[in-house]
Amino acid sequence: SRRQRQMCIRDRNKPLLLIQISNIFCLLGMMLKGYLNYYYCVYNWGSLGYMTVLNLINLVGMVVGALIFTFLSQHIGKKNCMFLFAGLMTISSLVLYFAGYHNAIVLFATSSVSTVCVGAVMVCVNAMMMDTIEYGEWKTGQRNEAMITSTRCFVTKCVMAVAGIAVAAVIGLTGYIPQETVQPVNVLNSFHFVYTLVSAGIIILAVVPMLFYKLTEKRHAEICLLYTSPSPRDISG
């Protein structure tokens, strides 16, 4: 059956499975901050204007991150890029966490670094996912590009739902008072904690599967040359 074929492809394409797991955490960390952005800016920082600035930073930063990744990955590889940008994002989140929600310059500076890193990591994940297409074809004899793309879309929708539930839980369980301009300190601290440390921790979890990811650029190039040979599955790997 079609489902059995898909499970077989998944089981034989370990790099794809690792990338999908990493993609889940990347999306969750990014969406968690995005969904909480309004509450964080309005209540922790006291003005919706901060959200406007942060959205502009996100728009520019994501593009800059993608461009930096495109250049840097040619020199140090995609996997190392992911480690680098995840580390930088963690550092920037730690700086914002310990600085608190009182210094706008720190907020904008750390958000700029984090957004550039998120942009680079997301492009990195997508690029590595595309590499698994040839790997899967080499392993199974089937080029399942459509299945990989549809699975990624399904994962994105699921993560959106989970992130929405998580933010709703944070708002509901911390004592948030609707329509109050001033929230209790524990609510503000919870928003700050989730916005900084929790989102950074999730990005770190996204890196863990990459420790087991063995499909390097060199190996991918070899497979691109070999999987069309008469006996592609006789090649070790």
Model feature map: region roles:
Residues 2-6, 10-224:
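Membrane-embedded alpha-helical bundles of multi-pass transporters/translocases
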Residues 1-9, 230-237:
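Single conserved hydrophobic/aromatic residue that forms the stacking wall/gate
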